[in-house]
């Protein structure tokens, strides 16, 4: 069975990356700073992804394991045994995650194996924000080997996760509620060699153009829905998005965006 490692076990890591990898037949290792999340995933041995608006697309995600960053040897083995790696820790935590991975590689040694890490954050220059501190923290020998054999690319996140009501969150703390969006474009230019086939992952030649488009469309539309929904008293993004009065505002927003 193919294997993947995800640095981060938050909502996007579980509810988007984890789901796509599971549906593509991968065994998944999660690495997270939160011991409660790691313990919960190991205890439940999986979780359920709820797709808003279409429960027929829901899926269980099983065949997983999780570690905190303290499990350095286990993480090292999982990284070099994996067919693909992802990072989804939150943009402000990229440097810390990079330092943790560098510490592990410095401890056990970089291997001359082709690997690709895809950074999945709503963050400017996400791949560079991870690669720069990682490279700096590696020893000279490990830096040369790691740099030669490891590609660090980035993806545009088009799916968001929402917070369920208090009762559901308490009853199913491991589960994730996400938008019904199934596309993960990745910067092909930063990939070394090739990556395995993964459901909904698309390697793009002109990644920069798509990233700019996404900033103006997906991010803006979510902001409009969230802000107007808040003003009208909604607490769930999907409920706000389905309201005719908000849809009309969104249509006018798209008209302005398309003029850019």
Task: Put a short name on every predicted segment.
Residues 1-7, 11-260:
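Substrate/ligand-engaging "lid" and interaction regions
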């Amino acid at each position: 069975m193919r294997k993947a490692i995800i640095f981060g076990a938050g909502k996007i890591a579980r509810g988007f990356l984890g789901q796509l990898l599971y549906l593509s037949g991968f065994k998944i290792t999660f690495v997270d700073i939160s011991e409660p999340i790691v313990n919960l995933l190991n205890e439940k041995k999986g979780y359920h992804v709820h797709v808003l608006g279409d429960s027929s697309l829901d899926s269980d995600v099983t065949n997983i394991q999780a570690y905190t960053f303290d499990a350095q040897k286990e993480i090292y083995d999982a990284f070099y045994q994996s067919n693909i790696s992802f990072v989804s820790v939150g943009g402000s935590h990229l440097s810390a995650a990079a330092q943790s991975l560098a510490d592990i590689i410095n401890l056990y040694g970089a291997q001359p194996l082709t690997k690709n890490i895809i950074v999945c954050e709503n963050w400017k220059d996400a791949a560079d924000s991870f690669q720069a501190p990682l490279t700096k923290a590696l020893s000279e020998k490990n830096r040369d080997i790691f740099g030669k054999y490891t590609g660090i690319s980035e993806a545009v996140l088009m799916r968001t996760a929402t917070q369920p009501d208090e009762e559901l969150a308490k009853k199913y703390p491991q589960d994730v509620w996400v938008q019904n969006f199934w596309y993960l474009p990745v910067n092909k230019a930063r990939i070394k060699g090739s990556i395995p086939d993964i459901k909904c992952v698309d390697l793009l030649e002109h990644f920069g153009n798509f990233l700019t488009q996404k900033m103006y469309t997906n991010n803006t539309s979510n902001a409009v829905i969230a802000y107007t929904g808040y003003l009208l008293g909604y607490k769930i993004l999907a409920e706000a998005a389905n309201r005719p009065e908000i849809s009309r505002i969104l249509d006018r927003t798209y008209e302005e965006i398309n003029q850019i």
